[in-house]
């Protein structure tokens, strides 16, 4: 299961070994049929820029009053996370994302109905984990379903956005002003995931043209 709001659920026990190899002997494969009745028109190249992984961040584990297993990226991004998992068979790992802390604890109520999570059921074999059918808007990552992080290593976060070239930059003698400007740059990056969106994290994530119309003149000064 996977969608942009609720995230992804992956049961590794259902994997088909070598499913994309010519040598795969999976008995339930069915022959395809050529569609000669539907007129799909000519294939053309995409008009928008490709979405790429533009930054890779190594998060730091933080201590919360609730003793949660939380990592901090130090920057709010749109994208996904990756890690290595070497867990006992049958363990269901839950990974949740959030944008901020409340009372120094993990917080996600601002996401409203969006679950924004990743669930992984282990086969007992070491595996590389990366969501493939969703994306998240987040700064914090919370692990649950395990007592500690034994078997979970190499945690990284990938910032994804359209392959735009940054054309403008502002640097001042005031670090707070610099941070304010950088926040606006990251907000633009986070919401330029193919089409300009209103937000990358909660249960909306729509390409409203009204939002883009208002922001377009400002955006053109940066990218």
Regions found by a protein language model. Name each.
Residues 214-223:
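Well-ordered alpha-helical scaffold segments within catalytic/enzyme domains
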Residues 1-202, 210-211:
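Extracellular/oxidizing-compartment recognition motifs
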